Amino acid sequence: MKVVEVKHPLVKHKIGLMREGDISTKRFRELATEVGSLLTYEATSDFETEKVTIEGWNGPVEVDQIKGKKVTVVPILRAGLGMMDGVLEHMPSARISVVGIYRDEETLEPIPYFNKLASNMEERIALVVDPMLATGGSMIATIDLLKEKGCQQIKVLVLVAAPEGIEALEKAHPDVELYCAAIDEKLNDKGYIVPGLGDAGDKIFGTK
């Protein structure tokens, strides 16, 4: 599995700001969007382009346009919504496919409860967004669903990943690509990433 930890100074700086214990909901939300945008830039760097002639201000002009499969952005509810706008800044016409999965607090197992996917998934590249890759359960369940619907090219964008989550994802889906802003030390006994960001969903939505 291709794993890319984006080491750009802006990414590292912004993730550092997100680790502050008393960060406001507004600031955390803004930074999640900004880092999501920067990860998208990296994840799409291998998209192919083709020459197209358009009508410019002074007559026909040849330009580069992205070719190939269409893109669908797949936020995992609810925290994934916090990164979605950052992705859409670069691809505003991308279709949105929503997947709802929550983690059982006792067993840590993923529980699917909702999905609404774009049409013709077999013709699309999926950019799956979720702030944290902890145990990997929710991400694996989401990718299972996407593949069941025919999607074969999948890129995962997360803010912070744990080694345990990376290992689980690679074992289940070695053909996907993972882009993250940080790979942290480990999971604690409650399944949270350490040092991590805390509960990203609560920080994005201002809930406890």
Swiss-Prot record:
Alphabetical keyword list: Allosteric enzyme, Glycosyltransferase, GTP-binding, Magnesium, Nucleotide-binding, Transferase
CDD domains listed in its UniProt record: PRTases_typeI (cd06223)
Lineage, highest ranks first: Bacteria, Pseudomonadati, Pseudomonadota, Gammaproteobacteria, Vibrionales
Cofactor(s) this protein requires: Mg(2+)
Name of the molecule in the record: Uracil phosphoribosyltransferase
Coiled coil: none
Gene3D superfamilies per record: 3.40.50.2020
Biological or metabolic pathway of the protein: Pyrimidine metabolism; UMP biosynthesis via salvage pathway; UMP from uracil: step 1/1
Substrates-to-products reaction catalysed: UMP + diphosphate = 5-phospho-alpha-D-ribose 1-diphosphate + uracil
Gene that encodes it: upp
InterPro entries: PRibTrfase_dom, PRTase-like, Upp_B, UPRTase/APRTase, Ura_phspho_trans
Family: Belongs to the UPRTase family.
GO biological process entries: UMP salvage; uracil salvage
UniProt keyword Aminoacyl-tRNA synthetase, yes or no: no
Superkingdom as given in the UniProt entry: Bacteria
UniProt activity-regulation remark: Allosterically activated by GTP.
Binding-site list for uracil: 193, 198-200
Glycosyltransferase in keyword set: yes
